Amino acid sequence: MNIQERFSLRKSAVGLVSVSLLCAIYTSTVAADTVVTGVNEIIEESQVKDEVSIESEKNESLDGSNIEIVEEIADNIPSPVIAEGEVAVEMKVDRGTENVVSRNDTEVTTSEQNQIEVTETKEILNQTSYQTESGEQRQIIWAHGITPPAMEQSGGFVKEKYGDYLNYTAPFEAGKGYYDTNKSLNASFIDLNLCFAAVSSNMVHWWLEQNSSYVERYLKEKKGTVNVEENYAITDLRRYINSFQNQQNSRVFDMFKTYYGYRTNGFVSDALVDLFINGYKPKAQGGVNLEDSQLVPDSRGGFFYDVFKEKKLTNRIFSGSYERFGEDVRTVLESKGLLGLTYRTLGYATHIVTVWGAEYDNQGKIKAVYITDSDDQQEQIGLKRMGITRDASGNPRLNNHMKNNSAGALLDYVHTIRLGQDLWEEYFNPLAKAKETASQTLADTKKALDLSIQGQSELPESMRLIYLEKLNNLYNQGILSIQKAESSEMLSGALENGLNSLKSLDFPISEVGNALAPDLPVGDRSTVSDVDSLSSQETSSTNLEADTENAGIIADGTNQLHFPVEAQTTSSVEAEGDNVFEQEADTLPIIIENKDEFGSELSRNMQTSETDSLVVAVEEDVKNDEVAQVEELLESEKVENQSSELLSDTLIVESANDKEEDRVEAVVSEQPDSIPHQNVEISLVEPTNVETETVVTPINDAATPHGSPTYIDNSVTESVATPLEKDSIQAGETEIAEPTSSESTNVETETVVTPVNDVATPHGSPTYIDNSVTESVATPLEKDSIQAGETEIAEPTSSESTNVETETVVTPVNDVATPHGSPTYIDNSVTESVATPLEKDSIQAGETEIAEPTSSESTSVEAELVDNSEIHAATSSVTPCGSSAYADGSTTESVATPLEKDSIQTGNTEIAEPTSSKSTNVEAASVDNSEIHADASLTAVSSVNLDNPVIEPVAISLIGSKRDTNAEVEVSSLSKREVRKTNTDGLISVQSKVIKKELLESSLAEAGSPLLEATIAQSSNSNSTEIGMSYQNTVLLESNNTERQVSKAEIVMEHKETELVETVSSASEPVVLVENISQTSNNTIESGKNMGVQSQAGAKQILGVEQSSKVSTPTSRQIMGVGLLTLVLGSALGLLKKRRK
């Protein structure tokens, strides 16, 4: 396909050449020549050569019925036009050239009714109006600086009709303000696809001409004189000033051809304009340039970078709907802009033309655009009128079809450019822009006061006119002062004086003042009766001072004034008729961080519904005495609840604090009735002072029936209940230092409860919901056993004052439905428990029940650290009436038993449970340099000092079941901690009680070894297993005041190969292996490598341990040790014999 055919197909898309015509001559070559036969009479000639047969061309060539070319009407009445294209068709036959022209004389008339009447031309918007043949009034908005073409008789537009297509064209006229850069006459390949560059060239030429005064001034400052005839370099701006000579000669277009010639595809016009003005380098894919303050101008352009910097003058928008497109085009033209319009031709190919004007009907709908096209170089055409129609889908189309609105070409993008004269002014006269801004500020203030004066209905009309006249005089004086300012300092002073003079106008605004209502307690309100001036407002009920000198006054068009009021102690302003603050106190969630002092700042902007009222926006400070009721439970009620909870299987962890004033918090938890060994006994030998502080926050959006106190905790809770002497506890990102006390116990319990949403709790069921990070430290003990995490916690009492027998079972619960009277605790948090500073004792944690090894003169330490263990709550759980549930869907960490000068570091190790008669056996699972990865919301306890590191989490899991094919023992580590022994003289013996339902086989190891009896108890209610050691099994050594080191011990427990204990189960055989590596200078025990036996899927692991401690003397301890050992050996042998029988 040659160039002419390609151009013809492109023009057919917009109706300049009939599609039926092209189909008829699908193999023909159309060469268009224009022959001027008379004034305002253009006859289009075309040569049509049939490549198939000359005879068919003689007999079947197109005649007048196929195409009708009509001479331009004398009065040149424009009508809907569609596109650019071939203007004439010349037919050649064997007898010569025959012009097939059918002239409709009925359309060629010069009557006045068909003459275009130019009714008005607006200089500012450059508009012209005319009347169509049918009598419709049309308006044309031209681009800024355009001299509209002649629309009267003898005008330049030619009317051409091709079947149902109607075209109007006009020849190019230089000096009319518009530009028509065309491609090469021979359609050279260098600019074959540079229609985008031609449009960019037109825009640049127009922009340079309209900004000629600024450009000349700029060139004089930068380059000196400009000689247009001189051949400047391609990168010299002076080369392109007044460089458009004709449609085929444009230096700007030549530059773009140099940079973008020989392209096989198109590009975007706005990118090239940005290159020329700012120096933006066009993006490879033609993306829109984003303003970049760090812009470095491209060396090929950026001719006006000093003026505009990174501020672009171009834009690219999608054509959108028909209505939107018409509004966008109008907006651009009326704002002194120019457009490039892209439309689709065949397939996805597009073409772009320059828009110089737009035509609208009397309803404001766009009907046509006036364009120049770079592809009409073969014709003497400048402007073309192309119709705009709305197709069936509501999209705009470039369409010259007179009947079918859905014909023609779909529009694509619109590229725009503006003059940027405001930026020119800022560059040459920075003070001018500042004056404009100052004048606008003064005008806005004047308008606000004007509306305020007119809105005073009680003010007599005569007085109103007097105030308005005074206001106008003050405003004019201020504007005059601003215009006379010769520097920025003078301008600032003039603006300030002008604003002050306007504000000094004193007129009564009592009615407006009625809208000012200070914030009072709910149910009481008052109004402001006396307001003396705009600069000072005083209220009768509240000291409300509004400094209007610093307040921006803004009018909103409905006779309302907005005064941003600044006040130190203000309240929300309430409009008359609006009940803004009538809210229930219990529906406002308030978090109290300090029980003595708290405050909340609420900012509200209120607007009155009346049009003549004043609206004041203030900031509200709520005082302490204005806060809604927050504390619902009294201290006595809390103590009562604690007592009742102790009687109903609730564990309350208490701690002693003798000298140091540390903040103590307790975590209260309960366990279901279905789990055995739930009795909790806390006995205090000496008087215990209990201080309970409870901060209860009302629940928001919670359905809580009558009498059911609900406590929700979504916060970060750290409970410290065990002052440890010379020991520090570090958990996650929290470090706790605890002093110890051996005498009276002072317990301060503080429970912080924060709100939760959408909790339904039946009548009388206290519910505790905790989604927080919890750290608990409990019961200062010197020699004891600790079980924390999701375990039963046994915490003995101190040596001289407290005997504690505790047990805690943590049951995972999610989606809890709590019946009547069932206190429920839900915890989706990271829990850290720190308990019972022990000297050389057993530490147990994490879904485990630990039995202490039996020894007469030895110290055993059994430790297990659970590494990153996650306890996932069950999907659904129902707690029976009267039971208590504690749901924990989080990571549990237990910290227990700081041992003196010992560091227990555990890794992925399994359980070792030794017994020894004369040696010190230490069992620990440890890994060096392990770190706690606590929850991100975990925060440090500010009231606790850090002295010495202690064990973080300690836990041992030993699980076995006769119904399980596998049992799993997992020992892992969360952190490395050092354990230091406290200087104590007392002795604590720990007795572990385990209720057993089924007794499995047990075997003895060697003759000299004490018996370790392992039992597995199957719970009938919870399908959980409990594994315990002996009924009474542990006697600890007496601790000395001097520090001593724990001797090395290496214990290996292995299935069927252990030297100490072999535990045999009917259905499962847990294998436990502990490697004791070595003891460092500070008695660090490291062990690793564990082997676990997995428990049956779905089985819950709930272990219970009851421990009690008694105070004994060294002599009684030895006697008790012998007795206990004898009792254990005897009972074990008896049971074994009975079992074998």
Swiss-Prot record:
Sequence ranges of Low complexity compositional bias: 738-749, 795-805
Protein topology in the membrane: Single-pass membrane protein
Protein task: Catalyzes the specific cleavage of porcine IgM bound to the bacterial surface. Can degrade only IgM but neither IgG nor IgA, and is host specific, as it exclusively cleaves porcine IgM but not IgM from six other species, including human, mouse and a closely related member of the Suidae family. Promotes survival in porcine blood. Is thus involved in a so-far-unknown mechanism of host-pathogen interaction at an early stage of the host immune response.
Name of the protein this chain belongs to: IgM protease
Gene: ide
Disulfide bonds: none
Main subcellular location of this protein, as a coarse class: membrane
Signal peptide: 1-32
Entry EC no(s): 3.4.22.-
TM ranges: 1119-1136
Positions annotated as active site in the UniProt record: 195 (nucleophile)
